[in-house]
Regions:
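Short, Lys/Arg-enriched N-terminal segments with co-localized hydrophobic residues
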Residues: 1-17
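Bacterial N-terminal signal peptides that target proteins for export
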Residues: 18-27
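C-terminal motif of bacterial Sec signal peptides marking the signal peptidase cleavage site
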Residues: 36-40
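Buried hydrophobic residues that stabilize the cores of well-folded domains
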Residues: 43-293
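Hydrophobic helical h-region of N-terminal Sec-dependent signal peptides
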Residues: 29-35
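A general structural-boundary detector
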Residues: 28-29, 253
Length: 293
């Protein structure tokens, strides 16, 4: 009788252990599924969509050239203003939009012309913009973005003015070539970006697409300050050259140079920009930076 009870006890113990193991497996599987459903899990627990420290080397810049950046209580970008000689634009960020077709909504208002538009941004698993609907009145333009394994933007397709495709080529973490092609008028622009013999590390994560990298980002440029357009280049650009070609065979070449002033941490304080078109005099401007430290 005692032997039978011992045998029953052992069998019961085995059954209980099996159940515990199965429950542990289920818990682990559920945890993994939860991890897959998050934008970032395990590798960077501090990742927050809209937080500029995702790209700006753990700083929250206040001023980057003609852009001023403002933050909410969670450290996310809430407002970006762009001001130049033509006026100001304001971009407002909503990370919990009522719209069900996007993860982030950016509302942009242009003060001088009383124009308003909305960017409905859908993110990929890394928290970068993948699909965007740009809505202005009854018009909808589409954007699509692709990134390399390092999280850097390599392709942009936009429907504005016909299908416009921008292809970006990198060398050692830096944008080396940009080709923009439009199916609407068969025009194209081919640009090369140089980083000089003495390269300057891009410690601030500066990526001024239109101004320095020959990428026609337009309204989507605001999204970069919230970390929504991928990782920055490894170094700061020191010059670029763009050759634009029309369907009629007309070509125009543009040159730009960038002279950087750095602080003790090797972050930009200012940059002197000189631009030259063929057979024209040069124009210059100075951009300043405030890293909010």
């Amino acid at each position: 009788m005692r032997m039978q009870l011992k045998e029953i006890h052992n069998k019961t113990k085995v059954v209980i252990m099996d159940r515990v193991k199965k429950q542990n497996v289920i818990v682990i599987l559920l945890a993994l599924l939860a991890c897959v459903g998050m934008v970032s899990c395990g590798d960077d627990e501090s990742f927050i969509v809209g937080k500029p420290s995702n790209i700006f080397s753990n700083v929250s810049p206040k001023i980057v050239g003609k852009y001023s950046i403002y933050y909410d209580e969670k450290g996310r970008v809430s407002l970006v203003t762009e001001c130049d000689e033509y006026g100001c634009r304001k971009a407002f960020f909503d990370y919990s939009p009522a719209d069900k077709d996007c993860d982030v909504r950016i509302d942009i208002a242009e003060e001088n012309y009383d124009e308003k538009l909305s960017l409905h941004v859908s993110l990929n698993k890394n928290g970068y913009a993948e699909y965007v609907n740009e809505i202005e009145d009854d018009d909808i333009e589409e954007w699509k973005f692709e990134y390399n394994s390092n999280g850097q933007l390599i392709k942009m397709v936009r429907s504005e003015g016909g299908i416009e495709t921008t292809t970006i080529t990198y060398q050692e973490g830096d944008i080396a070539k940009v080709v923009q092609e439009s199916k609407f008028d068969d025009s194209s622009t081919s640009s090369t970006i140089e980083y000089g013999t003495e390269k300057i590390e891009n410690k601030g994560g500066v990526m001024l697409f239109d101004e320095m990298l020959c990428i026609d980002m337009d309204e989507m440029g605001f999204a970069y300050f919230a970390g929504l357009l991928g990782r920055p280049t490894s170094h700061l650009p020191q010059s670029n050259k763009s050759v634009g070609s029309s369907s009629g065979g007309y070509k125009i070449t543009t040159y730009k140079s960038f002279s950087w002033s750095l602080d003790a941490k090797r972050q930009p304080v200012s940059v002197f920009i000189e631009e030259n078109y063929e057979n024209t005099t040069s124009s210059t401007k100075i951009y300043s930076f405030d890293w909010g430290e």
